[in-house]
Design a protein with these regions (language model features):
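Order/disorder boundary and secretion-linked terminal/linker segments
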Residues: 2-6, 23-86, 98-123, 168-193
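Bacterial N-terminal signal peptides
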Residues: 10-20
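Beta-strand-rich interaction surfaces with strong enrichment in secreted/lumenal proteins
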Residues: 60-64, 129-134
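Residue-level recognition of well-ordered beta-strand positions that form the cores
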Residues: 75-77, 92, 144-146
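Beta-strand acidic-aromatic groove motif in beta-rich domains, primarily in extracellular
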Residues: 84-93, 157
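Short proline/glycine- and polar residue-rich coil/turn motifs
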Residues: 111, 133-139
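Localized edge beta-strand/strand-to-loop motifs within extracellular or lumenal beta-rich domains
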Residues: 137-151
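Short, surface-exposed ligand- or partner-binding patches at beta-edge/loop junctions that are enriched
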Residues: 149-168
Length: 193
């Protein structure tokens, strides 16, 4: 029969393990976004896009996946990626090392299949160590940023979505919600190394 000292030692050890254990972080995330959940507003209206646009296919996210190990890779699949309207694909990143967000964007002008890539760290430095690729045939946009570019954080959380501007309207879709928030996109879980 264990003595009081060994029982106390076991309890203290269990407590220390429970308190110091790191939260579980997945190395990858996959998900679906409802088709037909695009929301719109007039471009001169200063409110959240609320008008449902179930027939709007361009910029409508249907699936996404993200992995993080040697690089952060986020692939987003759309119902349609035809070169219609001004298209903005944006990502916000939170990392284990930074107090503020990273901002990432691929801006594609009307009628084009390529755009301008922007990566800005939390200190407002514009970096050139990542890329985003638009593949209209596959209906995907893929973001890739090496972990070293992100300063090798233990984990990364990703929020992303798309906006298309056409005909005097803004059409928005958040990858993880059936609606659109007032600011930014909805974050996914921690992706850990």
């Amino acid at each position: 029969m264990p003595g009081p000292r060994s029982t106390l030692t076991a309890l203290v050890a269990a407590f220390v393990l429970a308190v110091t254990a790191a939260p579980a972080a997945a190395a990858e995330e996959e998900g679906r976004d409802a088709a037909g959940d695009v929301r719109s507003r007039g471009v001169s209206v200063d409110t959240v896009p609320r008008h449902p646009e179930p027939q709007r296919r361009t910029g409508d996210i249907v699936r996404y996946g993200a992995t993080y190990d040697a690089a952060l890779v986020v692939t987003t699949k759309f119902r349609d990626l035809a070169a219609r309207g001004h298209q903005e694909f944006t990502w916000f990143l939170r990392t284990s090392q930074d107090e503020f967000e990273w901002y990432v964007a691929l801006i594609v002008p009307p009628g084009k299949n390529r755009g301008t890539f922007t990566l800005i760290d939390p200190d407002a430095n514009q970096l050139d160590c990542g890329r985003a690729v638009l593949d209209c045939a596959a209906r995907t946009v893929t973001l890739r940023i090496p972990a070293s570019c992100l300063r090798d954080p233990a984990w990364v959380r990703v929020a992303h979505g798309a906006r298309v501007y056409a005909g005097g309207r803004e059409f928005s879709d958040d990858a993880r919600r059936d609606t659109v928030k007032a600011a930014g996109w909805t974050y996914g879980p921690q992706l850990g190394q």
